[in-house]
Amino acid sequence: MAVTQGIDAHTINQQHRIVIRNFSSFVSLIFTFFACYTFSEHDFKEDLFFRFIVLLPSFSYLILQYLIFFHTTWKGYCKTESTLRNILHSTLIVLLLAFVIINIFSSITFVTDKWNSEDLFFYSIILPSFFIPPTYLLSTSCDFITTSFTATGINILVDLMILLSYLTFLLLLLFLEKAEYRPYFILASFVLILVKSLKEIYLPSRESSSPAASWRVIIFALVFTLAVITHSLSAYVSISTLARYFRLSATGEVLSIS
């Protein structure tokens, strides 16, 4: 009886983890969308609390996810005779910890920065769409121990569609001045994440347990590289914002944060 109860409890915990893992990203996105179209630009320009509220879901999701990645990678990896593999996993652990620090630092910097009228759309729509999709893929379809992409069946197609939509959005955001097309790819990622989340909750798929094929390692490397790029840009913007703050302070100008 005790064994049966233990198995049932473990099954329930697994189901709860699946729900939280799949829906946390979706909730983060929908909350910021809701905030953008519910409150006025004046609210966010004048009130530090509103800025904190609009950024809290996304950065809470990012910080918690990368803390989980860091913990599981650090605890789950066993050293091997391969020096290269040991170096790779040590680098992963350091980068994951760096991502946690960057997200904490960026959340503080972005909240306290002075917002212009157009910044509401950027922080509530563009910024979550910039960070969340690669983090979602790392959370639901990647294994840091085997450094591979683990999706199977229809999830492979859905994940590749999320990845393609995100890459197109990134291209439009960073290299092409095609702002009118960005909402379509933001919406595409949003819908695909919702579809996969619902599918995994009600019809969960098994993860690949076979030795990592080359294409699985390549997809993992691509998704993780995207996470490195997004966090590098976030760190750069945060440091630039902080430098501007100190520069204004040194010249006697006041930088309003409320």
Curated annotation (Swiss-Prot):
<comment type="similarity">
    <text>Belongs to the UPF0328 family.</text>
</comment>
<dbReference type="Pfam" id="PF09591">
    <property type="entry name" value="DUF2463"/>
</dbReference>
<protein>
    <recommendedName>
        <fullName>UPF0328 protein ECU02_0090</fullName>
    </recommendedName>
</protein>
<dbReference type="InterPro" id="IPR019081">
    <property type="entry name" value="UPF0328"/>
</dbReference>
